[in-house]
Structure formats: structure tokens, C-alpha cells
Amino acid sequence: MTKQQTSVMRNASIAKEEREGSDNNNVDRSSSDAISDNDAERSNSHSEIDNESNFDMVPYSRFSHKQKMLLVVQCAFTGFFSTVAGSIYYPVLTIIERKFNITEELANVTIVVYFIFQGVAPSIMGGLADTFGRRPIVLWAILAYFCACIGLACAHNYAQILALRCLQAAGISPVIAINSGIMGDVTTKVERGGYVGLVAGFQVVGTAFGALIGAGLSSKWGWRAIFWFLAIGSGICLVFSTLLMPETKRTLVGNGSVTPRSFLNRSLILHVGSVKKTLHLDDPDPETLEPRTSVDFLAPLKILHIREIDILLSIAGLQFSTWTTHQTALTIVLSKKYNLSVAKIGLCFLPAGISTLTSIISAGRYLNWSYRTRKVKYNRWIKEQELQLMEKYKGDKNKVAELIHSNSHYAFNLVEARLHPAFVTLLLSSIGFTAFGWCISVKTPLAAVLCTSAFASLFSNCILTFSTTLIVDLFPSKASTATGCLNLFRCLLSAIFIAALTKMVEKMRYGGVFTFLSAITSSSSLLLFYLLKNGKQLSFDRIRANDKSAGRSVGKNSEKVST
């Protein structure tokens, strides 16, 4: 049987979700962008094929639904240790303050430095993952984190705590950005929102319930127990990742069917018969390999040079930093105003944790539904437009294709599909945070504090799912680098707000602080209207500029289809 015959037979079993929203007679209008002239990640901005490569009869990804779900579990497991390391520390903040005889501001610095390194590291390591592959960078990250946690568990002074918190954050934080890259490697736009939502949802379990875990461990065995817990857990994660995590970077493995050359990128799971059969490792699709790119440490700056991306990152960053400031304030207030024990403080994070988990997973599922619905309507509309143009130009297909390719009016509005519900969620969370601030300021009953915290958390992190999914859509081959920029914004803004929290409370009280933060966040959300109105045109113009600078005719070249 020839390779062509085998390919035809394989395509008879392509999953329905990998065909949904596609139409081989039309051309995609995804607002994807390249961050440099030589980047091969430009999408074919005018192909109706949302989910497959340019090569006929070859699926975009060989990973089955079950294998994608296993990747979700793998990403969530590693991502959990990145998110939990921040929140698990909150219940012992006042204990650290007393243990090392430091001020509240110095205790907050241990959180600030964590966020600084959590923001900076992914911007660097994400670029390495986009070049050398996801697997080796993830393994290095877990190993560095594992060593830092052991050091923290054995620390004897404040300086050691501070330095090792920096290493801990720098080590593990890149996995959040890399996880987005992994999902971009193996999923299509029509299904991506759900998978990204699942990964983000399970990752946020660490943030949502870390304080509860930390309170339970520290109240039973002392503050060092939280770091021993992280060391043991990350050690187990390192073993499983070494054995089971496959490489997904499309420059190295294509659609998953190509065996990577370097042993660092090869997992033992590739030797399992069922995996070899599903991925077609014995009958690969080398044509799906994307061109290799060199390491570009300036890639984040190129992404940050894009106006609409800056707006999106600012909005998401301000929202996340308000949420993390609320967590820090909750810890301090429950300990010093409400005089609760460490164990009870942990329990008080449960309502916000459940709300956060619910919101992120629900947001991902909503994005899938929204994308499919809008894409179906768009498909009908563009077919009608093509028929009208064919009549107008008397059946000149080339003329019609050129007109559609060169006019943004006919482009699918991916920005609107991903961001249209964001304004409502941002507004509701701002109301919740304002109410939370005044509740703790006047010391209302604890139930009111926890209810406002839960309400604000229910809507505050939706923007992370929306923005992460859109960023992966726009930069499928640089997803780790692009998502690292999101981490940079949200973590550095969090560091600034938390560092200033004590001083702001002295001047404005908690009510004034959260009214101020909510006002900034809700004001920034007005920029969403600019994105929703102009995002499609801005992305379209940027693609034209990049194509012209590379000497290509817009939409008429064999560029890679955005996933």
C-alpha cells in the first residue's frame, strides 16, 4: 500500500472536532501575526481550514482525544506546582514575620520577589522552549524548583528565604507559558478554548486551594512542612514527566508523528506500542514539520511592540494583580483583625478557590461554544459574499479570491470571538473587589468578607482564559514566548501592588485601596471596546505589512494555517 493510499485511509477516521468549522472551498481569515520577517508561524489568514495543516489529507495533530487529555493532566500537574507555591505561602506569612523578627513589609517582599521572577523567567525560558522543544525546558524547570524547595525547607534566616524564593519562582514559572505552547501544538482553534480552559482550571487549583493546603500543613507540622510538601510533590512530578511527557513542538515532531532526534526530547512513552500506532511513528508525516527558528531573546519585545497585544496584556495584568492583592490582604486581615488561627485562615480561602476554579473552566467551555457558533454564522455569510462577487465579476475566481484576501471586511473576527464577554466579567469583579475592600475595612461579619471574596473571584480570572486562548491563536508557533509576556505583565503588576499594599492601607484603608484598584481595572476594561472594534483590522494590516516586507503577496502563498 502506498503512502498516499495510507494517508487517504487514515483521514477517513479524522475526529469530527478536527473537521468542524472547516471548508476547503473557502479561505481562513484568522488574525494571526508573525513577530519577525523569517518566522514561519504566520497563519494563512484566509483559509476556512481551522484545524489542519496545509498538506491535503494529513491531520493537524496525530494525538488522539485521550492523549490530549493525558497531556492536559501532565500540564496541570506541572502547572499546579507553579501556582501553589505562591498561595501556599500566604497562611504562614505572619509566622515568617514573627519567626525571623521582620516587619510586615519585609515579609511581603518574599511575595514580591516571587512575582518578579515569576514574571521575568517565562519571557526568557519561553523562547528556549519555542526553539529547543517543550520537554527539556519543562524538566529543567521542575528540577530547579525541586532543589529550591529543599533549600527553603532547610532555610535558617530571612536572606536564605528571599534568595531561594527567587530561584523557586524562576525555576517553575516557565511551565505555565510552556503549557500554553503545548496546547497550541496539539489543538485546533475550534477546540482550543476547552483544552486551554481545562489546563488553566486545573493549574489554578494550586492558587485556589494552596492557602488551604498551606494552613493544614503548617498548623500540624510547622511552616517548613509546606516546602517539604512542594519538594516531595515536585520530585514525583519530575519522575513522571521524565518518563511520560512527549515532545510536542511542531518544529521537532510535526503533528506528533515524527520521532525527535535529540534524546532530551524523546520520552520512554514513545516506545509503547499503542502510542507508536496512534502517533504513526513508523509512518510519519515529515511534511508537517515546521521550519526551525533560532533563539530570539528579543521576541518578547517584538510581541510587546504590538499595540493590541499591549492593551490586552495590560487589562489581564491589572485584573490578576488586583486578585492577588486581595489574597494577600485577606491573609493579613484574617490574622490581625479577625484573630483567626492558621488552619481557619486556610479554610477562608476555600470560597474564593472554588469560585476561581469554576470560572476558569466555564470560561474555556464557553469559548469553544462561542467560537463554533460564530464560525458557523461566518461560514454562511462568506459563502453568500463569494457568490455575490462571482456574479459581479462574471465567474472570475482569481479576481474574487484576490479581493477577499486583500480586504479585511471579509476576515473572520477572531478577536471578537475570544474577547466579547470579557467586559461584563471585568465589571462584575471590580464591583466584588470594591465591596470586599470595604467589608474588611469596617470589619463586617466574616461571612460578608468571604462572600464578596468569592463573588469577585468568580469573575476575575475569566480574562486570563480569554486572553491566553487568543494569544495562542495569534502566535501558535511562539505560544510559550507570547504567553510569557502575559505572565510578565500580570506578575510584575502584582509585585508592584503587593509591595505598596502596606503603605496604601496606612493612607487609604482597605476600602480605599480596593476602590482605587477596581477603578483602575474597570477603567482599563474600556479599552476592550477599542480592541473589539479595531482588533481585526489591526491584525489584518500587520499581516499585510509582514508579508510585504518578506516579499510575499498577501494571502496567496502557502503559509501555515493558524491552528
From Swiss-Prot:
Biased composition range(s): Polar residues: 1-10
Protein name as catalogued: Quinidine resistance protein 1
Annotated source species: Saccharomyces cerevisiae (strain ATCC 204508 / S288c)
SUPFAM superfamilies membership: MFS general substrate transporter
Cytoplasmic side: 1-75, 130-135, 187-195, 246-296, 363-421, 467-481, 533-563
Family: Belongs to the major facilitator superfamily. CAR1 family.
Superkingdom of the source species: Eukaryota
Biased composition (Basic and acidic residues): 39-49
Membrane-spanning segments: 76-96, 109-129, 136-156, 166-186, 196-216, 225-245, 297-317, 342-362, 422-442, 446-466, 482-502, 512-532
Membrane-topology annotation of the record: Multi-pass membrane protein
